[in-house]
Amino acid sequence: MINRVSINTVINLANAGGVCGWLLLIRPLIYLIFSRRRELNAYSSVDSSAVVFIFYAVFCFYFSIRVLQKQKSSFARDLLTKSPLIWFVVYTLFGVASIFWSVNTQLTGFRAFECLSMAILMVAILQNVFIQGGCRLAMQWTILYVVVDIVFSIFRALSYTTNIVELLQTSQMMATTFFYIALYQTRKKWWNYLIIAMSIFSMSTVAYIGMALGSISAFFGHAKYRVVVFIATFILGTAIAVIGPYSFVKNTVFFDKKTISIHETTGRDKIMDVAFQALDDRPLGYGFFAGEPYLLYSKNLGAINGHNSLFSAAIGLGIPGIVLISLFFILMWKIAFSRYIPSDYRASLIGCFIVSFLQSMGNPGIGSRVFGGWLPTMFATVLICGFYVYGKYYEEIQDNDNE
């Protein structure tokens, strides 16, 4: 039952992120109003919709820098320099530099700036929430952000369908990325169940694999998590034994494909070939993001994105791009399991990272433009880095938070 008290609570929670928090929360609304479906060959066209998002990126960058300059805490600086985020920043700045050899200078420049703008916006938000309320508030704000995105995604989907199955798939990348946070953290409310339901019915093969692998997070949390995983594993193992491994995989992971094969990966194998060829042809790449639609459209692959962080890096920024993005992910794996992340939150964040990593390896994500899985995977990354920095360098604040 929604009442005035609950509305005020939500508003107060949103306010914890400051102006930057509101800018991120209204993005799904802006997307709902101004986004449009484009032909593949119109990926670089500038219309009223594109102008809105250009202004939005500029506003985000301006207010983020302003907030970071005014804040006395060094949390944001530590987050950007003492965590794997520094390699993402270097990767993105290299993307900006690629305007000098890009096949589309304007497209590369804007998309790289947009990535930098949104990343700094998230850093500013998490600085606000960590300094104000510590780990608990950071988790609560994250849940709010995910739910807001889901709600607006459903509203957008209602413009072209009322099929409940299709509606449950509208925020598959956002919901599944934060599945383990909804499962493990905060008191179970309708919003937790909404995220869990959207994840279960997402019909995303990549997400299902990520969620399955993410179950190892249970071994880093409370004993009750391990019991749940044991029961789920027992049920799953029994089902596989009864149905048979081939039939099980065919009817789940490859449920909409003719056979189990790398060639049934909706064209990702062909995109991989394009990425390898791009490395041969241009070791420095074709320019951040611009190279992806330029090559993939010319190959008639029906995509403008590499659907894999490494493929995107290879096509856009060549060998240096692969090195930088690989270093970023390797260090993210290291800190996701770090002892500096408070034990009460470690399981949630390990599960969250594993799903986000799989999203980046199988969907549009980190390494390319702000699209598809980029926002959830980037927010998950900044969140995990925030917990790491908070636990390692802000022990006094952490002690107060635990009290």
Task: Identify what each model region corresponds to.
Residues 1-67, 95-101, 152, 356-361:
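N-terminal signal-anchor transmembrane segment
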Residues 59, 96, 117-160, 164-222, ...:
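Alpha-helical transmembrane segments of multi-pass inner-membrane proteins
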Residues 19-22, 346-359, 365-403:
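Transmembrane alpha-helices of multi-pass inner-membrane enzymes
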Residues 219-260, 273-278:
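A membrane-periplasm/extracellular boundary helix in multi-pass inner-membrane enzymes
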Residues 257-317:
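Long extracytoplasmic/lumenal interhelical loops at the membrane interface
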Residues 44-54, 110-112, 160-177, 204, ...:
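Membrane-interface micro-motifs in multi-pass membrane enzymes
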Residues 72, 82-85, 317-357, 390-398:
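Hydrophobic transmembrane alpha-helices and their immediate junctions
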Residues 10-17, 79-92, 107, 112-116, ...:
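Interfacial loop-to-transmembrane-helix boundary motif in multi-pass membrane proteins
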